[in-house]
A protein has these predicted regions:
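Active-site/acyl-donor-binding loops of N-acyltransferases
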Residues: 2-23, 71, 88, 142-167, ...
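A conserved beta-strand-loop-helix scaffold within acyl/acetyltransferase catalytic domains
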Residues: 3-4, 8, 20-77, 84-95, ...
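Aromatic (often tryptophan-rich) hydrophobic motifs at membrane interfaces
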Residues: 72-84, 89, 104, 116-127, ...
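A gly/proline- and charged-residue-enriched helix-loop-helix capping module
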Residues: 99-140
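Short intrinsically disordered coil segments
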Residues: 101, 170-179, 338-344
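Short clusters of hydrophobic/aromatic residues that line enzyme substrate/ligand-binding pockets
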Residues: 109, 172, 325
Length: 369
């Protein structure tokens, strides 16, 4: 981990100055979005608002992992607002820290007035110091930290949706179109569901997929919370591909307003030749477009994962790069990190019994965030 000292609002001098001037952020206290009437309406009033800013996602993270919501909000006389989502992760393994947001690829601050969001950033830092946080990590809003080095960087991809399915299909790479047609000709069918039973089907495939990638699966409690707080509110769905009544691929999608998100995907490697994952994505694209979505976000991709990057680009996606920013509150410095998606542990989880892998995942994910 490398450290950088950057002049500005989060610099060593800035930290000292704000500590001696608490009135700079007087009256700004963190809130739980579930306790704020009309929170989701505030989120949707912002062009960049997404489900990850919503009460549903906050309840999901709090319910699954016991995280503490510490969101900051300020309003303006003209009705404009600035919103800064944060969660406190309190771990005896990795320490106490703030993340915007855990288990989330991107969740940028929402604002129209730069002065307002800077005030919220300062309030969050002072709150973090009062709580003994080691650090604060922002997964979005890179423009607010000019001159700061990124702690991590990833690719992101988004697909433009429209009602004309033929036009969308024509934008797909030829290999993707062939895969979809092959799945359809092979008798692969796709069902859309918001049920707990469908989530259990997905989770079984998810455990297989995580083993293939050499990673422990997330605890089922997390996906049960997604069902309880998101799917039951019609804010998402599960698409399941089956062949001869056997599930071979499944994915979890979210949608709030015009923004849809591909959040999790899983498949049975033994049936990869049937291209279930491709037809699942295609049916999800059509479903979200019919339900008013204008974009489908495909999540983050590690810079070194060329295979996943090619898969996402094959859907006619627009590629961008997202940079996270992490600030060490103990030393008043920005820090850089290494993407640790791959490592020696992948070989271990490739061979561990599934029961043991699930147990490890249930313990570790609460601390890793």
């Amino acid at each position: 981990m490398r450290e950088f000292l950057i002049p500005g609002i989060l610099s060593e001098g800035g930290a000292a100055a704000s500590a001696g001037n608490p009135s700079a952020v007087a009256g700004l206290q963190p809130v739980n979005p579930a306790d704020v009437p009309g929170w989701d309406a505030l989120v949707m009033a912002h062009a960049r608002g997404s489900l990850f800013h919503s009460t549903a996602w906050a309840k999901t993270l709090q319910g699954a992992y016991g995280l503490r919501p510490v969101y900051f909000l300020t309003g303006q006389p003209d009705g404009r607002s600035a919103l800064l989502p944060l969660m406190e992760v309190n771990s005896w393994i990795t320490g106490r820290r703030g993340i915007a947001l855990p288990y989330t690829d991107e969740c940028e601050p929402l604002y129209s007035d730069p002065a307002s969001i800077q005030r919220l950033l300062q309030a969050a830092l002072e709150y973090g110091r009062s709580r003994g946080w080691k650090s604060v990590e922002w997964r979005g809003g890179r423009e607010l930290f000019e001159g700061a080095p990124p702690s991590l960087a990833f690719y992101t991809h988004s697909v433009a949706l429209e009602a004309d399915e033929e036009r969308v299909f024509a934008r797909l790479e030829s290999s993707v179109r062939r895969a979809i047609r092959k799945a359809e000709k092979s008798g692969v069918t796709v069902t859309i569901s918001q049920s707990l039973a469908a989530m259990k089907v997905f989770y079984k495939l998810q455990c297989q997929t995580r083993r293939k990638h050499g990673l422990p699966p997330q605890p089922f409690a997390f996906f049960k919370n997604i069902f309880e707080h998101i799917l039951t509110r019609n804010l998402g769905m599960i698409a399941i591909a089956s062949h001869q009544q056997r599930p071979i691929a499944a994915s979890v999608y979210f949608q709030m307003g015009a923004r849809a998100v591909y959040k999790y995907g899983a498949s049975d490697e033994a049936f990869q030749h049937l291209r279930g994952a491709n037809v699942v994505m295609w049916e999800a694209i059509k479903w979200h477009a019919r339900n008013g979505a204008k974009t489908l976000h495909l999540g983050r991709t590690s810079l070194g994962n060329e295979g996943l990057r090619r898969f996402k680009l094959g859907w006619g996606a627009t590629e961008q790069k997202i940079e996270y920013v992490k600030y060490d509150l103990r030393h008043n410095r920005y820090v850089t990190e290494t993407d640790e998606t791959t490592g020696w542990y992948n070989r271990v989880f490739n061979i561990l019994p599934m029961g043991l892998s699930r147990l490890i995942g249930a313990v570790l994910y609460r601390h890793c965030a």
